[in-house]
Amino acid sequence: IGLGDYLDFASPSNRQRLRSAALYDAAEDTIADKALELVFDLFETALKPSVGRWLGLLEGHHFYQLKDGTTTDMRLCEMLKAPFLGSSVSGLLEFPNPRTNKGPGELWIWVHHGAGSGETLAAPLSKLDNLAKRWEGYDIFLMGHQSKKIGGSVDHVMPLRVGGQLHLIHKTRILACTGSFMRGYQEGRKDGLVPRGNYVEQKMLSPTQLGAPIIYIEPRWHRIFEDGKERREVWQPDLTIVQ
């Protein structure tokens, strides 16, 4: 799943200023052509091998709006043969039960590009943790935006009554901030002939570990027995995050 900001161009304030500039059509077309060139370069350089393997791509804060009503994010989706998911998405993954025909196990995912900022490593994870408390039934929460790669798992305990017995079912939730592929401090970086750091360096922000976390999903059903007989199967997948 893509979480947005695939290009550094253009931020919301950049887009607003370009709109207010009342440029001639030729100038607008030149900017649009350059924006599409950046998309094509990203596709050819890094993403081409992943065509057809995406569940979808979200919109971030950085994109360019084209005259035909589409955006550079939507054009990237076309290249990757992936659906465009907008601002956020609730996704459902289904896992068939190999033992019965009672229906698949359902894994719900909540995904958002993200918003806000924070200096500490735990800042985006704390934001995600607070939000997750309001969303019942979800198993995985993903957020981008802040460029930090950090995640964790928490267990929720739910009561379940089977026949006359009360059982406690433990289900794992994954919370993950999905990282970045933009290095903050680059030796010898220049703008033209001027030695100048990028946004991260200029704002004296903390460097972050590059890459994205990996989440492993192992389908599993917990079998409940009473008096030596199986009474019920409960969907209880094993979820693990590796950073």
Task: Give the ranges of each region predicted by the language model.
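Extended recognition/assembly regions associated with phosphoester-bond processing machinery
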Residues: 1-243
